[in-house]
Each structure stands twice: as structure tokens, then as C-alpha cells.
């Protein structure tokens, strides 16, 4: 199998890109793709012909044990399985919407599960007025979907951003370092932000000393299109943004 990880901070168009590559034939967005954070847990997109199309979900409570995701994959009864009807775009959307599921718990429970809780308004995870914290409902998801590229052995790892990368040890120690390629997705309308740099430097760029197969993708190029500019001016603007993002 060829493992390719898609990594991006929130609102970089990562889910939209995956939708365009794997689900364009449905004429609709199949993976949740809205402003803000949509992918709440690491999600593998693959195809295993021995199983029916489905999404397998590992409850977040499994982080309370010492077992890794790889170990949990050997125990089918630990996962919740939702069948997928690949003939219906609406049914696909309903099933895959689970990657956005959240649950509210008290601060002590969230911290026991390994989540870092911040007190500032800018913190990704923080205690709300009712004393609870919103965390992902699932630790990991595996989507079994019969796409031609997936049938040939391609496995896509969709990651949920900096906060999850930093709190799920298996992502930083195993899944990302062992991926054959990592696509780091930036948005043309934001360029390189400080959080983008943090993800790159700590988890992708030279992490583990491996540089081969690390690719930067500048997404949302259409945000630079302007009806009042000529094609040459738009091309020049895109080139400037590419130069600005390169490092």
C-alpha cells in the first residue's frame, strides 16, 4: 500500500481537495467541508475488498488505555461500524459526517484523555461557560470506499490540524513519519501563518530527519482570481504568493 498524508491547519481547503479528488463523481461535497474545523479525528481513506463499504469509528475513550490505534485495529469489536451506501450522495454524506462528531466532557476528563486545555479565547480547546470542553467524539476513523485509486492500494490519511497532531502520539511517532508522502496544504488567501510554520517545523519538514516525499501544496488559488485584473496580472499575483510561501 502507498500511504499519503494530507496535513493542514483549519480552513486551508484540505477536505475540499479530498472531495474533488475522490468524490467528484457525486456532484456534491461528501466529506464535511465548511468554514472552520470539519475533520475532528485522524481519518484513513482506503479500500479493503474483504469488507463492505463503511466507516469504522474508534471511540475517543480508547485514549484512556495504553493501546495504540494499530493495536486497536486487531479488535473489531472496539470499533463502531456505519455502513455506506455508495449509490447515494445523501447517504454518503450522512455516514461520513461522523468525522465531525464532537462530545462535551468536563475539564478533568478531557485532560485525562490527553487534551491540552487553554484558558485564552484563542485556545483551540477551552472550558466553556457551562464548565465543559468540546472534544472529538472519535479517536480515529477508517473509511472503506471503492475508488479506483484506493483499489490499487492508495491510502489517504486525513489529519485534523495542529491540535490533534500534537495530542495523538501515534500521529507524530508513527503515522506521519511512516507515510510515503506528506502533502502539506497551504491556502493562497492566507499564505504561511505562524501555526502553519509550527506544524511544518515540528511534525513534517525535518522531523525525524526525513525530507523525501514532503510536498507543499498551495490551495485555493481561485481566491486570487479577480475580474478586474488581466490574466497576466493574476498569474503574476499567483507567482508572488508562491514565492512568498516557499521556504
State what each model feature region is.
Residues 2-247:
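Globular "head" domains of long coiled-coil molecular machines
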